[in-house]
Amino acid sequence: NNIKVSVLGSDGYTCQIPRIKEGMKLLGHTLSEDSPDLIYSNDPKGYEKALILKEKYPNAYLIFNFLDIPWHIENIERQTELLVKNFFLKADAVSVISSKVQKDMAKFYDKKIHVIYNPIKDVYFDEKIKKNNMFLYVGRANDPVKRIKLVHDSIIKIPEGLKNIKICGSENPGFGNYVGVISDKDLNKLYNSSKFVLLPSKAEGIGLPMIEGMICGTIPVTCSDNLTAREFSPSEFICEPNAQSIVNKIEELDKEYETKREMALKLGEKYKIQFDKKTIAKNIIDIFNSEKN
């Protein structure tokens, strides 16, 4: 059954909305804000507009999705309580992007919380691309939770380390080869040509570079205090959140690189389907169908 869907939230090249919209279209649904059957907001940026649409079209089914609780922010408990009161309690359903966020949100919201994940970029394993780059970092480098300093302090201990890292995203941390925001095609080449993707974040909603890396046969190195890493990544790729531990982990993985890379690729095959934009769109529609009927 094809339905009319409004997809709201942060809508920019580096955001998830463009891919969720593509997923909806691939499933044959129509994107529309004119008497939609389903209103979906991927993050708080779209919540207000979603409520206005819901008031206008009370029969529409409203889903609020939530990305993650940034525990490091002052008054975050209070802010989250207000979010629940002002928004979640007015929704027909609430979803999140990982089991970790589901557990976090359950402290504030006692109704059912669906896990839908969020879509990866259009990346894939390309065996023709040679591994000619050692390290890759993908993400908003200056967000304190991302702990970019750990990347710097680790690779500075590795000969030529600083020369062998490429950093892509909207923020320049001031070291390594910063390439800025790049197309999916170029990002795909970067993942495939790099040996390791470093993601030492303290917390992530998902940590898509870890997933995208494995899909492309790049080993993600993550930290043990990031609970989402433990949800999706093998324990062999996880180390303590300090520079020496990261260096030791890189050296250990590099010694058995081919075997460990196979492990990443194997998981990547599963994640390529699980995190595909069409799958995510279907997960959203499934909530609508199961609750509506």
Residue ranges of model-derived segments:
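Carbohydrate-associated surface elements
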Residues: 100, 119
